[in-house]
A protein has these predicted regions:
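Active-site beta->alpha N-cap acidic-glycine motif
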Residues: 2-96, 100, 104-107, 111-114, ...
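C-terminal domain-boundary segment and adjacent tail
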Residues: 15-26, 53-54, 67, 186-213
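A cross-domain feature marking catalytic cores of carbohydrate-active enzymes
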Residues: 34-36, 61-63, 85-87, 125-127, ...
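Divalent metal-coordination and catalytic microenvironments
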Residues: 35, 50, 59, 83, ...
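Active-site environment of divalent metal-dependent phosphoester hydrolases
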Residues: 39-42, 89-92, 129-133, 153, ...
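A short acidic, amphipathic alpha-helical/loop segment
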Residues: 45-46, 71-75, 134-137, 190-194
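Non-membrane alpha-helical structural segments and their capping/turn regions in soluble enzymes
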Residues: 98-103, 161, 185-188
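His/Asp/Glu-enriched short active-site or ligand-binding loop at hydrolase and phosphoryl-transfer sites
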Residues: 115, 129-171, 202-213
């Protein structure tokens, strides 16, 4: 059984201690999240942009890229953002056994702990594909899956201006978790247009809250 990325409604019915789809619905709160980094070219530009606008975010990192770019992970933490687990090699999770899936998670757990001395970190599955067996395994271990409630579509072959216009015309609701990616420059181009408007509107750009102990 696989729960597809378009089924946020289904995951949203599960307890938040198992799956986080939205953040606290405080007035103006919007939770930024970025997958697939760190990237040596695009992540620094994105961090510069977030710093200029006093915005915070959660970065769901790939283990192999953590090993390749540790200084970027250190910068993410130093600038007040939070870390999440996005597997070690970003494989097609549904083709792996449960043990192989957990190995991907645990290997990246160990890497992340070296940077922020915390854990276990929230895990966002590659491509958002969640299996029932992984949900059950996480429930037994008291682990937390992080999903999203608003997809920026920044991985689609659309001009950033069009994607930014969509977000302005249909803005995220308070508490929404916005899915973006920092393995390309698209997210930074979108946010360069959105962050000034959101701040003018009184929105607060935040990282996801820490996992409850």
């Amino acid at each position: 059984v696989r729960i597809r990325p378009t089924r946020q409604q289904v995951l949203g019915l599960l307890p938040e201690r198992l799956v986080l789809v939205r953040g606290p619905r405080e007035p103006g709160a919007l939770y930024l999240s970025f997958d697939d980094g760190p990237h040596p070219e695009h992540t620094p530009r994105l961090l510069d942009l977030l710093a200029r606008h006093d915005a915070r975010a959660s970065f769901f990192l790939i283990g192999q890229r953590i090993e390749q770019h540790p200084a970027l992970v250190e910068r993410i933490v130093a600038e007040g953002h939070t870390l999440g687990n996005h597997s070690y090699s970003h494989p097609l999770f549904h083709r792996l056994s449960l043990r192989e899936q957990l190995d991907e998670v645990e290997r990246t757990d160990r890497l992340l702990a070296d940077f922020d001395r915390s854990g276990p970190h929230r895990f966002r599955p590659p491509r958002g594909v969640v299996s029932l067996r992984l949900l059950l395994a996480f429930a037994r271990r008291g682990r937390n899956l992080a999903y999203w409630s608003y997809d920026s579509l920044d991985y689609q072959p659309q001009p950033p201006d069009e994607l930014a216009a969509r977000l302005l015309q249909r803005p995220p609701a308070d508490g929404d978790v916005l899915l973006m990616h920092d393995d390309s420059d698209c997210a930074a181009q979108i946010l360069a247009q959105l962050l000034p408007a959101w701040h003018t509107a009184g929105r607060s750009l935040r990282a996801l809250p820490a996992v409850a102990a």
